[in-house]
Amino acid sequence: MPKKNEAPASFEKALSELEQIVTHLESGDLPLEEALNEFERGVQLARQGQAKLQQAEQRVQILLSDNEDASLTPFTPDNE
């Protein structure tokens, strides 16, 4: 696992690490201090992932705004 404050190399790696953290936390087998550290790392990864998604959305909007024929509509994620 990367260092606690180190950003993953890609969005996909961050998501994979976050999924592993969720699995560890859901198992209920971690000592309290380790669970808190894992939770903290998960929050960091979630925030980094959200920032990367926002950057990607901005890039798409910029690219579409360069094309006058393309219509730009706000993104609304599907709630699962």
From Swiss-Prot:
EC number of this enzyme: 3.1.11.6
GO term, biological process aspect, one: DNA catabolic process
Pfam families (UniProt xref): Exonuc_VII_S
Disulfide-linked positions: none
Gene Ontology CC annotations of this record: cytosol; exodeoxyribonuclease VII complex
InterPro entries: Exonuc_VII_S, Exonuc_VII_ssu_sf
Primary localization: cytoplasm
Keyword set, alphabetical order: Cytoplasm, Exonuclease, Hydrolase, Nuclease
Compartments in which it is found: Cytoplasm
Hydrolase as UniProt keyword: yes
Top EC class of this enzyme: hydrolase
Any one GO molecular function term: exodeoxyribonuclease VII activity
Recorded catalytic activity of this chain's protein: Exonucleolytic cleavage in either 5'- to 3'- or 3'- to 5'-direction to yield nucleoside 5'-phosphates
Function comment: Bidirectionally degrades single-stranded DNA into large acid-insoluble oligonucleotides, which are then degraded further into small acid-soluble oligonucleotides.
Family: Belongs to the XseB family.
Subunit-level organization: Heterooligomer composed of large and small subunits.
HAMAP family the record matches: Exonuc_7_S
Protein name, per record: Exodeoxyribonuclease 7 small subunit
Taxonomic lineage: Bacteria, Pseudomonadati, Pseudomonadota, Gammaproteobacteria, Enterobacterales
The encoding gene: xseB
